[in-house]
């Protein structure tokens, strides 16, 4: 087993209630938020133009290689009808530590009012990952969503792709026989 890695956190993460400026390019939607842990920061956008707001862990967690855990964030939200939130992995955690969100992206429906929890997985084969309360662990992306009116038909209309599915466009030579 490798040395324990600490993923770190931004300065003043615990207890800060910094709200970053929203880019004028993006529209805004009012999202009510309930802070279940008063010492943790609210989700925030790190940079203007960012699509995802950082979520932090409400607890200390150590994930052994290959281990998964559902981690509390200390917040609950109320999305307006017609919106959903999607929980995405943080690219730096995935690239540097092998830490990812198991069901990426996780979906938070507009009607859900419970605590947002993030199912994390340490994909590193040898090194445990240490998360300290207040560490940024995932990103929350709020999106407008449409509801489908499903209409059963006997045949589907044609398309250029047709029924081509997994790997139908090629793009790699893995497993191909060489002559």
UniProtKB/Swiss-Prot annotation:
Gene3D superfamilies membership: 2.70.40.10
BP term (GO), one: dUTP catabolic process
Chain positions recorded as substrate binding sites: 90-92, 103, 107-109, 117
Keyword match Nucleotide-binding: no
EC number(s) given by UniProt: 3.6.1.23
Known catalytic reactions: dUTP + H2O = dUMP + diphosphate + H(+)
UniProt keyword terms in alphabetical order: Hydrolase, Magnesium, Metal-binding, Nucleotide metabolism
Cysteines joined through disulfide linkages: none
Broadest EC class assigned to this enzyme: hydrolase
Pathway: Pyrimidine metabolism; dUMP biosynthesis; dUMP from dCTP (dUTP route): step 2/2
Superkingdom to which the source organism belongs: Bacteria
Cofactor(s) demanded: Mg(2+)
UniProt signal peptide: none
GO molecular function, one term: dUTP diphosphatase activity
Keyword Secreted set for record: no
Family: Belongs to the dUTPase family.
Protein task: This enzyme is involved in nucleotide metabolism: it produces dUMP, the immediate precursor of thymidine nucleotides and it decreases the intracellular concentration of dUTP so that uracil cannot be incorporated into DNA.
Descriptive protein name: Deoxyuridine 5'-triphosphate nucleotidohydrolase
